[in-house]
């Protein structure tokens, strides 16, 4: 019996450690998992999300999937929505002070988070909390007590604060308070483990520090997951950078975006996003190297897996069929944006109004480069007028517009 528990704990710890950059307090995590398998006693893990954007992308899911792994091994997840701290704005990695959100924006975005996380997390083992529950009650005396727990000198050790201080870029006192408030969340929740990205290390360690300072009998472990690179393979996945794959993307878009990553980045996505074991992934890599498995097929399988997870197997297979139809067989897609106009229209103007070109200047350049087709015939004249009827305008391989001229 004891031997069987030890094996299960070892397997759990291998799963937990997969793809993780750093774990502080791994022995404590192992003791919690072992306790669960011996007695069934659960433990508390948490990760905070400031709802500054309404949609999750795959970069967020690296952390959320790790939380789901913990749920399999005895954890109750607290998905903490930082509605209070979002009205301050986390300065992590920023060179300028961020504008706070209104309460209405925060609550609207928080609802969107809740709708999405249960695509990954087990609802029966997840608690959604808002940190306004305790931070609004902190009061002046509580805030003074909290700020007395940490020095300005220690705060300036944080990399982004240090850089801004040396460059004489303004740092507001509110921004100093942010990591203290995030750390206080761990005190209020008495969390056993906290998750975050590698860029959050300072704030995560603040939780451990404050748990000690407030006399808690526990000191949370900290687990840091890597930052997922975006589609460009260089910068971190970010909606503002446009290099993201959103959890709520349409199946066709999600599938196509996964296929657009480089062969090298594909393996990074496999490690951090796929449900396949590391042994299975290593076998795939060996098969690709030996020529037994084409990189394109490996990428298609990854795109199918990810699209199925956030939609359905049927949606994923239809997305693959649509992609093959448009990009492999050079056929017209089943669905595309549509623009209706009255009277003939200049092609460049139609491209802009239909949303397949940002400007008439860019439309001209695309035509001159030979990238524009009408009804699968290359456009030669940048001054072409389109008259009565239906015209399928194509820019490159990915952009289509159905133009109906009345």
Swiss-Prot record:
Keyword Ribosomal protein among UniProt keywords: no
Residue ranges occupied by any S4 RNA-binding domain in the UniProt entry: 345-405
EC nos: 6.1.1.1
GO MF annotation terms: ATP binding; RNA binding; tyrosine-tRNA ligase activity
Taxonomy, superkingdom: Bacteria
Keywords: Aminoacyl-tRNA synthetase, ATP-binding, Cytoplasm, Ligase, Nucleotide-binding, Protein biosynthesis, RNA-binding
Major enzyme class: ligase
Intervals of motif 'HIGH' region: 51-60
Pfam family name, one: SYY_C-terminal
GO biological process, one term: tyrosyl-tRNA aminoacylation
Subcellular localization, as worded in the UniProt entry: Cytoplasm
Matching SUPFAM superfamilies: Alpha-L RNA-binding motif, Nucleotidylyl transferase
Reactions accelerated catalytically: tRNA(Tyr) + L-tyrosine + ATP = L-tyrosyl-tRNA(Tyr) + AMP + diphosphate + H(+)
Motif ('KMSKS' region): 236-240
GO cellular component, one term: cytosol
Function: Catalyzes the attachment of tyrosine to tRNA(Tyr) in a two-step reaction: tyrosine is first activated by ATP to form Tyr-AMP and then transferred to the acceptor end of tRNA(Tyr).
Oligomeric and partner information: Homodimer.
Family of the protein in this entry: Belongs to the class-I aminoacyl-tRNA synthetase family. TyrS type 2 subfamily.
Name of this protein: Tyrosine--tRNA ligase
Source species of the chain: Wolinella succinogenes (strain ATCC 29543 / DSM 1740 / CCUG 13145 / JCM 31913 / LMG 7466 / NCTC 11488 / FDC 602W)
């Amino acid at each position: 019996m004891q031997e069987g528990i030890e094996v299960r704990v070892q397997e759990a710890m291998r799963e937990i450690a997969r793809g993780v950059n750093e774990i502080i307090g791994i022995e404590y995590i192992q003791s919690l998992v072992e306790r669960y398998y011996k007695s069934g006693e659960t433990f508390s893990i948490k990760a905070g999300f400031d709802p500054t954007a309404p949609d999750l992308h795959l970069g967020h899911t690296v952390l959320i999937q790790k939380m789901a792994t913990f749920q399999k091994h005895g954890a109750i997840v607290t998905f903490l929505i930082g509605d209070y701290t979002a009205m301050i704005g986390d300065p992590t990695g920023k060179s300028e002070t961020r504008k706070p959100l209104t309460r209405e924006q925060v609550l609207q975005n928080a609802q969107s988070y809740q709708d999405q996380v249960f695509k990954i997390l087990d609802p029966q083992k997840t608690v959604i909390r808002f940190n306004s529950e305790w931070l609004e009650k902190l009061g002046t005396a509580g805030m003074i007590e909290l700020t007395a727990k940490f020095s300005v000198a220690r705060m300036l050790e944080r990399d982004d604060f240090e850089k801004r201080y040396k460059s004489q870029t303004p740092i507001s006192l509110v921004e100093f308070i942010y990591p203290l408030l995030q750390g206080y969340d761990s005190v209020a929740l008495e969390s056993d483990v906290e998750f975050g990205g590698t860029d959050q290390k300072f704030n995560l360690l603040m939780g451990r520090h404050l748990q000690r300072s407030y006399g808690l009998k526990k000191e949370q472990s900290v687990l840091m997951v890597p930052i997922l690179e975006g589609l460009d393979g260089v910068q971190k996945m970010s909606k503002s950078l446009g290099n993201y794959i959103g959890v709520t993307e349409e199946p066709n878009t999600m599938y196509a975006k996964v296929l657009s990553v480089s062969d090298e980045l594909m393996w990074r996505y496999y490690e951090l996003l796929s449900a396949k074991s590391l042994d299975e992934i290593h076998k795939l890599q060996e098969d690709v190297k030996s020529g037994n498995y084409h990189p394109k097929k490996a990428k298609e399988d990854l795109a199918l897996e990810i699209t199925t997870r956030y939609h359905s197997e049927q949606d994923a297979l239809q997305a693959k069929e649509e992609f093959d139809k448009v990009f492999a067989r050079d056929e017209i897609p089943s669905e595309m944006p549509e623009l209706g106009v009255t009277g003939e229209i200049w092609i460049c103007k139609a491209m802009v109004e239909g949303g397949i070109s940002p400007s008439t200047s860019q439309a001209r350049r695309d035509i001159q480069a030979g990238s524009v087709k009408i009804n699968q015939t290359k456009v030669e004249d940048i001054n072409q007028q389109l008259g009565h009827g239906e015209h399928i305008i194509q820019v490159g391989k990915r952009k289509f517009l159905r133009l109906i001229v009345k």
